[in-house]
Amino acid sequence: MTPTIEIVETPTDEVVTALARLLPQLSSATPPTASELEAIIAGGGTFFVARIDGQIVGCLTLILYRIPTGLKAWIEDVVVDEAARGNGVGEALNLAAIDEARRLGANAVNLTSRRERVAANRLYQRIGFSARDSTVYRKYV
């Protein structure tokens, strides 16, 4: 089962429903509505979905931003349905996002992953990411 990757330009009910099923496997955040997903895309985010046999089984968001040191890219909210893991979905999604970031001129792609996501961290290292000696801080506002 080889996954196919698509960039979502206009969120359909199918995409919103799939995200409502997938996102709880990653986070306790409330899944976005169609209009919120449209705002992410309109704001410069690129939303990818992965399909196996026509069904959406994974997604990620690629965000690009320009700062004085260049165009940077972040991969966020990578999630693969538990039932589809081990089929190359995460790898295909990440490689598609990296290709898109490169095509758009980014000079680096960053992502974060919790330590306990052992398989995900192994994947990121296998496809060329390296851990940075950095600490990520967060402040809720």
Residue positions per predicted region:
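Conserved N-terminal entry element of GNAT/NAT acetyltransferase domains
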Residues: 1-13
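Active-site rim helix/loop that mediates acceptor-substrate recognition in acyltransferases
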Residues: 27-47
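Conserved beta-strand in the GNAT
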Residues: 49, 55-64, 74, 79
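Active-site beta-strand termini and strand-to-loop segments that position acidic
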Residues: 51-53, 139-140
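A conserved beta-turn-beta hairpin within the catalytic core of GNAT-like acetyltransferases
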Residues: 65-75, 85, 132
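Conserved acetyl-CoA-binding loop-helix of GNAT-fold acetyltransferases
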Residues: 80, 86-99, 122, 126
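Conserved active-site alpha-helix within GNAT-family acetyltransferase domains
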Residues: 91, 115-133, 139
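Conserved GNAT acetyl-CoA-binding A-motif
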Residues: 101-113
